[in-house]
Amino acid sequence: MNKAGLYHHCGDQWCYALDNDTLHIRLKTAADDIDSVDLVHGDPFEWGKIDGKQVWRSNIQPMTKAGTNGVHDFWEIRITPPYKRLKYWFLVHANGETCEFGEKGLVSPPDRWNTWNTFIFPYIQPAEIFHAPEWIADTVWYQIFPERYHNPDAASGTEKNT
């Protein structure tokens, strides 16, 4: 497992609100290095007792491989947190090895009840959600390639453009 290939940041294009209820979360890994990724997630303030011990309540969901650019693979998932906030970390599976990837880095073996190596999305703020203006639906977009309008070498009969 290429540990240097793992990257996530709680913000920007890696974790953001799609709408008032949904978070979109992405993880970047080295290309063709990881077999699967699961997201361990839950509300940061939901705790319960298991075997007489207070533990953070969390769920595990598989992420989907969204694409690759030949250097990195990109994994993603959409989550609907019940209270618009989320604590989460990743379970990364590769070559029979499973590691936990969180804010503090990579940990092996993973601790299912981990509360110290997590990412936290504090709250889905309506002001942070992108809303396209109404006029954009009626817009016609053009791509202009200026180099295709003038060929200074036209007399030579070549197809060369500037």
Predicted features, each with a name:
Residues 1-162:
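N-terminal structural segment of carbohydrate-active enzymes
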